[in-house]
Amino acid sequence: MTLRLQPVQVATGSDEDGMLIFDGHRLVAVLVRLSGVHEDLGVAGQWFLETGYGPLDVRDNPTFADLVAAEAWVKQRLAERA
C-alpha cells in the first residue's frame, strides 16, 4: 500500500487547510486541519477526517493529533478491508 498526501484548500468556512489522501491513484480520504475556532474544544491544530471513502467511510469521523497518526489509522483501516 502506497499512501500519497496532497495539500489542498477546502471550502469549509473556518477550516481551510486540507489534505487529500490517495492509496495509489484512488482518493480515500479528505482531512482538514482544525482552526483556532476549535480551541475551546482542545482540538485546534489537529486533523479531522472530513470524509472517507470505502473502508474509511465511518459513522463517527475521528480527529488525529498529527498527520502521522492519521496515516497510521488510514493504513490500518485499509489493511483490515484488504
Language model: regions and residue ranges:
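Acidic interaction surfaces
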Residues: 11-15, 34-36, 62
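A short, charged, amphipathic alpha-helix used as a generic interaction element across diverse proteins
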Residues: 54, 62-82
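A generic structural signal for ordered secondary structure
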Residues: 27, 60-62
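Negatively charged, low-complexity tracts enriched in Asp/Glu with abundant Ser/Thr
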Residues: 1-27
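Short aromatic-glycine-(Arg/Gly/Cys) micro-motifs in beta-strand/loop hairpins
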Residues: 32-60, 77
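Intrinsic-disorder/low-complexity peptide segments enriched for small residues
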Residues: 1-3, 29-32, 65, 76
